[in-house]
């Protein structure tokens, strides 16, 4: 395997390669490349987000995160349709990312719920037809981040400029990497194939309802950071119900682990080191091969910002509470919605007979 090929491996792939290598010299080489890759990706991510922050303003650093996530995914993922029509999907997705989060922050919670339902459903239809790609973890996450870190006035204009630039970059990279895909399905087929009886469509509806309603409940309660519960719900609401239970347990447990580690670091480290805690979390994510520890280290960046706004104890308590509530709420809704679907199916069968 070449140096470049090893750089393309996931953390799990690199760890498996190191584990399976018997020759000590080759093993050291693989370990060195793996470490190099982790820090290279970290430096690249920090550089991209820094550039966006410098050009668009510090409050728009989230645009850099959103675009970066999309670029990393669109290098390899597709939409299950013709590549030229995939470009239309990208334009539609970015149109929602530009308008949806801003408008939802301008209206009362119930109206915001309706806007979220429409926007998230469209993101699912346009970006998540190829279920195994897990594209929702990129596009819906981007929507929630932009909504949670809202801006107005000139900063919003700069946000629009940044997202439009990101859209063009994504379109170029997507077309370059995916132009030889053999799909015959068109953009409009994504909407034509919306069928309440299909597992894919039921997942669309389930995720959209769970995420939007969870954020509505938090907003009506007057709690900050409603996006945290939305992200938690999105993260554990998987296409297949049998996968949900394990993901929920990992989300709840390792979110607490991450918060505990963050709290210790926040107390032990000098205040001058606080801005680097998020970066430490990013390195931890790079070394994490599984969802559990990725969840733990992902808490660092979010808490670094929230601790400065609300104080560390409240930020940690809020993070733990919203994530636990989101996981439990998703589990409950998943079971109820699946039971309703089974009952409807059984009734239809009995009527047909």
Go through the PLM ranges and name each one:
Residues 1-260, 264-297, 305-353:
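Alpha-helical transmembrane segments and their membrane-interface boundaries
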């Amino acid at each position: 395997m070449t140096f470049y090929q090893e750089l393309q491996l996931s953390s799990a792939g690199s760890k498996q390669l190191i584990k399976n290598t018997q020759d000590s010299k080759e093993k050291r080489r693989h370990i060195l490349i793996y470490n190099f890759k982790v820090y290279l990706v970290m430096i690249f991510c920090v550089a991209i987000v820094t550039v966006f922050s410098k050009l668009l303003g510090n409050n728009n650093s989230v645009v850099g995160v959103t675009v970066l996530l999309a670029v990393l995914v669109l290098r390899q993922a597709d939409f299950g349709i013709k590549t030229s029509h995939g470009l239309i999907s990208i334009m539609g997705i970015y149109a929602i990312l530009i308008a949806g989060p801003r408008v939802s922050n301008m209206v009362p919670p119930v109206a915001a719920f309706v806007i979220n339902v429409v926007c998230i459903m469209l993101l699912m239809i346009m970006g998540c037809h190829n279920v195994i790609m897990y594209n929702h973890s990129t596009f819906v996450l981007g929507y929630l981040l932009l909504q949670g870190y809202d801006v107005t006035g000139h900063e919003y204009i700069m946000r629009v400029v940044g997202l439009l630039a990101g859209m063009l970059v994504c379109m170029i990279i997507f077309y370059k990497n995916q132009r030889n895909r053999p799909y015959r399905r068109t953009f409009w087929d994504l909407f034509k194939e919306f069928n309440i009886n299909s597992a894919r469509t039921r997942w669309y509806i389930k995720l959209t309802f769970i995420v939007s309603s969870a954020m509505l409940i938090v907003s009506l309660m007057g709690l900050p950071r409603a996006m945290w519960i939305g992200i938690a719900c999105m993260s554990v609401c998987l296409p297949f119900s049998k996968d949900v239970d394990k993901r929920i347990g990992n989300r709840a447990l390792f979110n607490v682990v991450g918060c505990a580690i963050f709290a210790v670091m926040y107390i032990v480290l000098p205040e001058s080191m606080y801005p680097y805690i998020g970066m430490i979390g990013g390195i931890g994510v790079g070394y994490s091969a599984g969802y559990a520890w990725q969840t733990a280290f992902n808490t660092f960046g979010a808490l670094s910002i929230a601790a400065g706004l609300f104080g560390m104890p409240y930020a940690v308590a809020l993070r733990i509470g919203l994530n636990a509530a989101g996981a439990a709420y998703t589990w409950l809704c998943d079971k109820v919605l699946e039971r309703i679907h089974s009952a409807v199916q059984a009734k239809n069968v009995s009527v047909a007979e």
